[in-house]
Amino acid sequence: MNIVIALIPAVMWGIMPLVVSKIGGKPRQQIIGTTFGALAFAIGVFIFTNPEYTATIIIASFISGAFWSLGQMNQFRAFTQVGVSKTMPLSTGMQLVGTSLFGVFAFHEWGTTSKLILGFSALALIIIGIFLTSYQQHKDENSGQNMKKGIVTLLISSVGYVGYVVITRWFDISGWDAILPQAIGMVVAGLLFSIKSEEKRFTKQTWLNMIPGVMWATGNLALLFSNKLVGIATGFSLSQMGVVISTIGGILFLGEKKTKKELILVIIGVILVIIGGTMIGIAKS
């Protein structure tokens, strides 16, 4: 049962990009809907828990949530530029590299020689995996430009995601205490990011995108439980498996085309990212 709970984040976060893409809408509508869903879920959690708030917890968690919106909105943009099956392994790999480097240099993780060797070997595998998943066999001017835009967009996205993780870690804030102020920060940032949009912010797609927002929040809550049930290393490693669902789902359910060579390299790349993520989880233990 513990492993089932620990797999919920991977399932929720793996399916979420597929649901967002099926619902549709512009990235600004998607981020507003997703953050509204996360806020609704956070309010429900708040009612049944007893979080402890200080000014530091509220402000830092709010800023952390704003960084998440930066990361998530740019991930949505990348879906339109390079597709879900390329975006998710690239995004996961970049996040693993970013958070791991912060962990080593800011929080002095991997404190032994063996853990340093294991951790940096994992980063090498992840970087190789990133290159493999971004491979394009038949490049034309349009697809090449989209890939360049997608990589830049995902670099910005990764800054957001890494900031989201690092800020609460820096101030040693419990995930339970952070949930509501983080969600408020997500909503405020999502609304601010959409101010200059020419499209309507509130459409049918906006409200439907509350569903993936609840899915993301469910995965986040399950991760808090799984860290206690199976340990941070195992919980973290299992949560990375969602990239398999989203990558394969992008190809099978969203109809994203791959040549045989691209498909083989994507599969190898995803496997390397998962192995690297698992090794990082072990190095964290």
From Swiss-Prot:
Subcellular location per the Swiss-Prot or TrEMBL entry: Cell membrane
Transmembrane segments annotated in the record for this chain: 5-24, 31-48, 53-71, 84-106, 116-135, 151-173, 178-195, 207-226, 232-254, 263-282
Keywords: Cell membrane, Membrane, Sugar transport, Transmembrane, Transmembrane helix, Transport
CC per GO annotation: plasma membrane
InterPro entries: Sugar_transport
Recorded GO MF terms: carbohydrate transmembrane transporter activity
Record membrane topology: Multi-pass membrane protein
Entry-linked Pfam families: Sugar_transport
Family affiliation: Belongs to the GRP transporter (TC 2.A.7.5) family.
Protein name per UniProt: Putative sugar uptake protein lin0212
